[in-house]
């Protein structure tokens, strides 16, 4: 006769699961990209919130300093005007990059051409002030000569 072996079902399940666990290691949740995605998103939102907090605090500080009785406002204006005077020389300079290997970068100050056309409204004046004055003198001399020749007086409005 055959020997009878009686085993319960629970023992079979226990032995079969233990065999499967020995061959496969359990997978860590950090092997998935999802935690890294949400972690990066949380870090980015945290940095944005921190920047907004700093911006709000600086705005609050500026608005509260303007509400004072004006005790320190004059001192701040004086210090700001001193800063402007110190930075005035550098304020109107531009970086110019030129072609070449020797000193290709310069700080350039923009030059404005001054208009010398005070009394010549609507006319194009190309000459300098001295030559304009000479031309006006010649015109006056020409008018005086005409007056002497004709003997009549003319009025000129300047």
Swiss-Prot record:
It is a single-pass membrane protein. InterPro entries: GDU. It is found in: Cell membrane. Residues 65-85, 126-158 are annotated as: Disordered. The chain crosses the membrane at residues 37-57. Expressed in the vascular tissues and in hydathodes. Expressed in the phloem and xylem (at the protein level). Probable subunit of an amino acid transporter involved in the regulation of the amino acid metabolism. Stimulates amino acid export by activating nonselective amino acid facilitators. Required the interaction with the RING-type E3 ubiquitin-protein ligase LOG2 to fulfill its function. Plays a role in the Gln export at hydathodes, at xylem parenchyma into xylem sap and from mesophyll into leaf apoplasm. Acts upstream genes involved in the salicylic acid (SA) pathway and in the geminivirus-host interaction. Overexpression of GLUTAMINE DUMPER 1 leads to free amino acid levels accumulation, plant size decrease, hypersecretion of glutamine from hydathodes and to a full resistance to geminivirus infection. This is Protein GLUTAMINE DUMPER 1. It comes from Arabidopsis thaliana (Mouse-ear cress). The gene is GDU1.
């Amino acid at each position: 006769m055959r020997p009878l072996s009686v085993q319960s079902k629970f023992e079979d399940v226990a032995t079969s699961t233990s065999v499967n666990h020995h061959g496969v290691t359990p997978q860590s949740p950090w092997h998935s990209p999802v935690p890294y995605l949400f972690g990066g998103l949380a870090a980015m939102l945290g940095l944005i919130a921190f920047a907004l907090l700093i911006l709000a605090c600086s705005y609050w500080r500026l608005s509260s300093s303007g509400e004072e009785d004006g005790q320190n406002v004059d001192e701040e204006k004086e210090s700001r005007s001193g800063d402007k005077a110190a930075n005035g020389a550098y304020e109107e300079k531009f970086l110019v990059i030129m072609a070449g290997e020797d000193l290709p970068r310069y700080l350039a100050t923009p030059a404005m051409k001054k208009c010398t056309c005070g009394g010549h409204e609507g006319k194009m004046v190309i000459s300098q002030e001295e030559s304009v004055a000479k031309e006006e003198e010649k015109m006056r001399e020409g008018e005086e000569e005409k007056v002497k020749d004709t003997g009549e007086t003319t009025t000129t409005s300047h």
